[in-house]
A protein has these predicted regions:
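The conserved Walker
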Residues: 11
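Conserved lysine of the Walker
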Residues: 15
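N-terminal phosphate/diphosphate-binding loop that engages ATP/GTP or pyrophosphate donors
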Residues: 25-94
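Cytosolic-facing regulatory segments adjacent to core modules
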Residues: 82-89, 99-138
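Inter-motif core of Ras-like GTPase G domains
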Residues: 124-128, 143-159
Length: 159
């Protein structure tokens, strides 16, 4: 079972710092667990805080602007392609820790098939990790627009 933690608050409130603190705590307490950092903040600062320059996002997959690290395998369905592209944009941070960036994802009100396909691919990705930490915008609607999933704990950072 995946544990999901969302850290939210207004810009500049320390969300990224707190997200990284929780990462360290989880790494110390559960070194064998796999952890996914999910940067769902429009500023996308979480990757930068590790010295990473992450340019590929879920938004890029949605809009066809994803820059591939590898060649696209042939004969895939659209769903298989989206799942493959999600794997392609995962960036390793350290042992057992990966990061993925969503950036802007659109609205759940959109009836386009890509919305459901991305939701399904994200759910499948989340299930592969023991712990997922979401670094979110001030409004959790951005997380809800990306994926329909239950969050175990939400931390609201205020200054």
């Amino acid at each position: 079972m995946t544990i999901k933690l969302a850290v939210t608050g207004k810009s500049g409130s320390g969300k990224t710092t707190i997200t990284k603190a929780f990462l360290r705590i989880f790494q110390e307490l559960f070194p064998e667990k796999s952890i996914l950092l999910f940067d769902n903040d429009l500023a996308s600062e979480l990757g930068h805080s590790f010295g990473l320059d992450i340019r590929n996002t879920i938004y890029g997959i949605r809009n066809g602007k994803h820059e591939y690290k590898t060649g696209i395998p042939e004969n895939m369905t659209k769903q298989e392609y989206i799942e493959w592209a999600m794997e392609d944009i995962l960036v390793p941070v350290c042992d057992n820790v990966d990061i993925i960036v969503s950036w802007f994802v659109g609205s759940k009100d959109c009836r386009c098939p890509i919305t459901n396909q991305i939701n399904d691919a994200v759910l499948k990705l989340l299930d592969r990790y023991d712990i997922v930490i979401f670094d979110c915008e001030f409004d959790l609607k951005y997380l809800n627009q990306l994926v329909d999933t239950d969050i175990d704990t939400t931390i609201i950072v205020a200054n």
